């Protein structure tokens, strides 16, 4: 998920990768003294709970980096939202945010793998999540997921198709479906917030594409066709 303002910025300083302990597998950036040549552009998420006014479309590689950065921030943000929901005794909402976080974690790894396969390094600028009330966190999450599923990922998919980037195209198309599902879950939680105090429902998350569902009888993933055994139960 992105749910944040995307800013493509070329750095004039050397770029050093460091591991962000809050997000497994995510590489954060640090700025050092000027290098002999400009560093490659990286994508920065600014105020992660806001939806950008303008969608920036780059090359497929740049779009993969933007998606990686956004999903990395979404992973951390949803974990923080889950903690807040638990504090406010919305235990079902906390479970939902943990399921969404797991889905985003899968997206992070998926994009990193492709970026590295294409000869680059996945870089994310991890921002501290802006945590408000659970109701406000759900509202922000709905906006972010709808923006990703209706605008960002379809635009990225269109660009990937133009560049004959088949693997990226599949990732972007599948992600649009998954993020739209997240938006629906969050909308439902908002509409029924008063009933979300007790955690009664478990979620399944596909470890291949991040598909999230409450259907415990599912036979295979409707997005990537992975078998039921691939799904992880979020309790």
Stretch-by-stretch model annotation:
Residues 1-15:
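Sec-dependent N-terminal signal peptides
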Residues 20, 25-235:
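Non-heme di-metal
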């Amino acid at each position: 998920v992105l749910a944040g303002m995307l800013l493509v910025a070329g750095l004039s300083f050397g770029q050093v990768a460091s591991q962000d302990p809050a997000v497994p597998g995510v590489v954060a950036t640090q700025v050092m003294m000027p290098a002999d040549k400009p560093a490659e552009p990286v994508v920065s998420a600014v105020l992660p709970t806001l939806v950008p006014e303008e969608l920036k479309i780059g090359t497929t590689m740049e779009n993969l980096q933007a998606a990686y950065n956004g999903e990395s921030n979404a992973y951390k943000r949803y974990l923080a939202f889950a903690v807040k929901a638990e504090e406010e005794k919305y235990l079902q909402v906390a479970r939902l945010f943990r399921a969404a976080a797991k889905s985003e974690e899968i997206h992070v790894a998926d994009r990193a793998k492709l970026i590295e396969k294409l000869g680059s390094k996945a870089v994310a600028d991890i921002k501290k999540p802006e945590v408000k009330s659970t109701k406000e966190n759900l509202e922000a999450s709905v906006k972010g997921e709808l923006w990703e599923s209706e605008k960002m990922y379809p635009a990225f998919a269109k660009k990937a198709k133009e560049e004959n980037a088949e693997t990226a195209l599949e990732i972007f198309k599948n992600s649009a479906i998954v993020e739209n599902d997240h938006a629906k879950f969050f909308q439902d939680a908002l509409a029924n917030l008063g009933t979300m105090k007790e955690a009664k429902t478990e979620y399944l998350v596909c470890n291949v594409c991040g598909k999230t569902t409450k259907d415990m009888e599912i036979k295979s993933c409707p997005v990537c066709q992975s078998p039921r055994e691939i799904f992880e139960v979020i309790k």
